[in-house]
Amino acid sequence: MVGGIRNPVLSEEIPGHPGVRLLTLHSPALRRRGDVTLYLPAAAGDRPLPLLILLHGVYGSHWNWWALGNLPGIAREMLAAGEIVPFAVAMPSDGLWSDGSGYVTHKGFDAESWIVDDVPACVRELFPQVETQKVFLAGLSMGGFGALRIGAKHASRVAGISAHSAVTRLADLRGFVQDSIAEDLAEERSDARILYWMRQNRLRLPPIRFDCGTEDSLLAGNRELHASLLRARIPHEYAEHPGGHDWAYWQQHVRTTLRFVSQIASGAAAR
């Protein structure tokens, strides 16, 4: 039992999917079970492994980046080509609150603490070679919002932040969900704003990068966030690429996230 995490259940490696395992654990933050898809590269052996926590979007779950995004296959390919160093990837569910939790706190349900506390603690307990003192956060769409906001809020615990096609305000979820969740999540409180936390923790922020497709309905919000960060003189990288809000775009550009993690992890290891 780790910090209230009881009886984690870990699968064997999934046949035909090297390095992929499925994990279910009791989460104190969620007050229920939570699911995680894990990828640990075979080439790592017992060497210390940085941890990337990769978040999904609305209507999704922990298996999305594996089954729809081919994340483990892309990572294996890049590792074999020498493009990245080995690191672990945890792909958790958002807690499965309604159509999407926004990775924020609801009544009796703390999706934020699930991501920054419970997931790293359980992964570390099961795989002691995984380093969790500082983790990398990344995600797509709603998961991009989660990575940017949680990463900025918990800046001292995060080594790098990357987002693809990010929701930049919770109100933007109205364009994706069909029930009252958007209204519930879209309270204009400062705690829910990316820019609020980036300003609050500007001197402690890790490296930040994000991108968006030029045919994505969220492009305007990403441009606005980029402009706001420039005005606030908060260092970051922003890019636009041809493409929409779909898996074709995310499969292509998650490679940038993997390189980003590898470069930072390599620099940290060299110090």
Tell me what each language-model feature is.
Residues 1-271:
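Non-catalytic cap/lid and distal C-terminal segments of serine-dependent acyl enzymes
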